[in-house]
UniProtKB/Swiss-Prot annotation:
<keyword id="KW-0456">Lyase</keyword>
<dbReference type="InterPro" id="IPR033644">
    <property type="entry name" value="Ferrochelatase_C"/>
</dbReference>
<keyword id="KW-0350">Heme biosynthesis</keyword>
<keyword id="KW-0408">Iron</keyword>
<comment type="pathway">
    <text>Porphyrin-containing compound metabolism; protoheme biosynthesis; protoheme from protoporphyrin-IX: step 1/1.</text>
</comment>
<comment type="similarity">
    <text>Belongs to the ferrochelatase family.</text>
</comment>
<dbReference type="InterPro" id="IPR001015">
    <property type="entry name" value="Ferrochelatase"/>
</dbReference>
<keyword id="KW-0627">Porphyrin biosynthesis</keyword>
<feature type="binding site">
    <location>
        <position position="277"/>
    </location>
    <ligand>
        <name>Fe cation</name>
    </ligand>
</feature>
<dbReference type="InterPro" id="IPR019772">
    <property type="entry name" value="Ferrochelatase_AS"/>
</dbReference>
<keyword id="KW-0479">Metal-binding</keyword>
<comment type="function">
    <text>Catalyzes the ferrous insertion into protoporphyrin IX.</text>
</comment>
<dbReference type="Pfam" id="PF00762">
    <property type="entry name" value="Ferrochelatase"/>
</dbReference>
<dbReference type="GO" id="GO:0046872">
    <property type="term" value="F:metal ion binding"/>
</dbReference>
<feature type="binding site">
    <location>
        <position position="196"/>
    </location>
    <ligand>
        <name>Fe cation</name>
    </ligand>
</feature>
<keyword id="KW-0963">Cytoplasm</keyword>
<protein>
    <recommendedName>
        <fullName>Ferrochelatase</fullName>
        <ecNumber>4.98.1.1</ecNumber>
    </recommendedName>
</protein>
Amino acid sequence: MTKSAKIGVLLANLGTPDSPTPKSISRYLWQFLTDPRVVDLPRCKWYPLLKAIILPLRSKRIAKNYQAIWTEQGSPLLAISRQQKDALQAYLDTQNINAQVEIAMTYGNPSIQSAVKNLLKNQVERIIVLPLYPQYSSSTTGAVFDAFANALKEERGLVPFDFIHSYHIDENYINALANSIKVRLKSDEFLLFSYHGIPLRYEKMGDYYREHCKQTTIAVVNKLGLTENQWGMTFQSRFGREEWLQPYTDKFLESAATQNIQKIAVICPGFSVDCLETIEEIDKENRENFLKNGGQSYQYIPALNVEHAHIEMMGKLILEKLA
């Protein structure tokens, strides 16, 4: 391809607080938990509960977790996202694509709104939105679409855009996952695929996230040639009292040893960037959970982050839209 009209690329992810303090985290959680895509309870009931109980308690507890993983460059999610941006920009440059890549967060900073403004200020003639959620869910990819649409509402001129809905069975994505696992998985380890959960009620309302997770898992399992007793699939990070997608990751790990699973490797294919939910919850809390309940060894297989195959996959998704 030759250089022509300038395109804008939005690498969209969930977001992060600006600092690991209760105040900053409370502000971030308010934005996150008041999005009806995430929590669809009646506002008259949800908001008072959120303000009076949930935010004060969760902000203090989560602050300690963030402080344990915070870096000089900010949260791991933000630091790695910046690296992804630079790497994707470099890849597109090698493909002779006239592009400007921006990272954009649904909640927190840099916001999707500010990223869109940056692109339009630099006179891009087309925008490609890539939510870094391989498996579609209304509460993640759907929320990115809402935020992007709201950002465009403020503009009189509507530039053409493409929105990448999902890539859960994209060949390059599956190969990147399989290769990442292959170089780390030991022959005697059980492989657990852990995905972020959603309320079961959302699935009953039409969200097909679980099916996307299954399709990703089966594609990777087939690529690796694993047998039925060598792998499992669970869902993590639930909160609140209602039922979420099951089986739950923490409950599975508590009882794994009783199922003769002594050595385990956990991968989280739905996370494109390592963050609080993988570093603290999976690599620390669930490691402790598994080992204290009779497990012998536990390894967390990192997110694809800035692996070359991951960046190349992103680039090829962009190139497909330009073909």
